[in-house]
């Protein structure tokens, strides 16, 4: 049989319960104050994460609008200046009057890219038109086009690798690679990377072919 508690015991228990409740309430208030001081939401007086994000987005948009416009103008100005090896080497040759033919890693990598673009616009396009029926081509025909492209790429890369690996020390490679490395060292590191369109690449390919004739 459970013993009934005396008034003293009952009062003592109530005091402890009240003390524990007060302590818990103080801890809760302390944590709330700490959270408010650290929370970016409460620090701005916002009620929700969404409203705070909206505030931050508006501030970012307003503060970044003018710098972004300047960057856009700078980007436009940068794109007007071409920095392909062909342009850089042509300008250097005009100033230095050197009679060395274009060569080197940067030159040949540009030639390969130009040749690939030229092959798509000319060689493969003509092959497709000759094989297509009602403007369509089955998988066998597509495979023939792909192998045609592969044959060209294999030949180009094989010749370039032979030149660099087994062709011996090339004075032209050393000279023109050094020219382009010096050019890259002087280019603004914060400028926007130049984007070359397919038509511009085709023009570069034609210019490269004309320079080699």
From Swiss-Prot:
Residue stretches of biased makeup (Basic and acidic residues): 15-33, 43-58
Cellular-component GO terms for this entry: host cell nucleus
InterPro entries noted in UniProt: Bocavirus_NP1
Keyword Transcription regulation in annotation: yes
Origin superkingdom: Viruses
Region (Disordered): 1-80
Subcellular location: Host nucleus
Principal location: host cell
Pfam families in the cross-refs: NP1-WLL
Keyword Cell cycle found: no
Sorted UniProt keywords: Activator, Host nucleus, Transcription, Transcription regulation
Family of the protein in this entry: Belongs to the Bocaparvovirus Non-structural protein NP-1 family.
Chain's role: Required for the expression of the capsid proteins. Performs the splicing and internal polyadenylation of the viral capsid-encoding mRNA precursor, which allows its maturation and expression. Transactivates the viral promoter.
Protein name (record): Non-structural protein NP-1
